Amino acid sequence: MMTIDALLRFEFDPSVNLWVGRTLVPSDRPGLNGPYTGMSWNQYRQPLFSADYDGPAGQLGRSEGAVLWGMKNKFHYLLGVFEGLEDDYGNDSDHLLFAGRLAYNFLNVESNPGYYTSATYYGTQGNIFTTAVTLQSQSDGTGSKAESGDFFAYAFDVFSERVLSNSGVFTFEAGYKEIDVDFTLASPPTASTDKCFCLFDGDSLYATAGYLFPKAVGPGKFQPYVRYMENNPNDAGSSDTTEWGLNYVIAGNKASINLNYASGDANASGYAGNDTDTVTIGLMLQFY
């Protein structure tokens, strides 16, 4: 059994909150959206930050640590310190993982549980335009027991949702991230036979656009979308995937049906996989 979240929450004021325990590391927007509010189906075809892998630096974007966060007017800030990579992989000095995010809401202020974000609100929060920058860093945050290396990453993202005059909703999200590590899947430590926590070194970008039709058809509304993802490692060839999809939104994030066609060779490692063309039908149900 996996423990996803286990934390103490000290919530003094909207501008000052402290979460301590096993919790989500401040990340870029796809990381804070999670899989349950995504407008697209295949969003995890890009390289991840270290805690996002199911490995020694965290699980599902979580690690043990603390996050100071809050909202002041239109500014939203996150400052975190975490355990990050374990000493079994070369972090013998127990260097910590530092993570931070600063976002600014130019129009309506986004409202979510805690410091999470969403990939679409289906127009329920009005007109939104948010930009953000994210940083993560850990000395000895990659490599092996015999030969450790550092991890550093930054990301920029933008999110816009606009309710049009016909009550339709246009949603746009885009982001760019760059990850700098000493050891990668393609360039592991040469002087060691130990297991390696090797990541991606390079840059990645994505963009998603969708439109929610205003008129209901039966119990739901149709939302066509397109998403493009591109990965550019420094030690291998580039890869990309394009996804065309159609959501049938019945009850927001609680109930929807997805049909999508995806073409390309991008995957979560950041390195090119098989070049495939797939058609997927999915059902999202959440009870809360």
Model feature map: region roles:
Residues 95, 107, 111-233, 240:
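Detector for outer-membrane/organellar transmembrane beta-barrel domains
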Residues 13-15, 72-74, 126-128, 165-169, ...:
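Strand-connecting loop/turn motifs
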Residues 1-87, 92-112, 178, 199-215, ...:
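Outer membrane beta-barrel
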Residues 18, 131, 170-174, 207-209, ...:
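Hydrophobic beta-strand residues in large extracellular and virion-surface proteins
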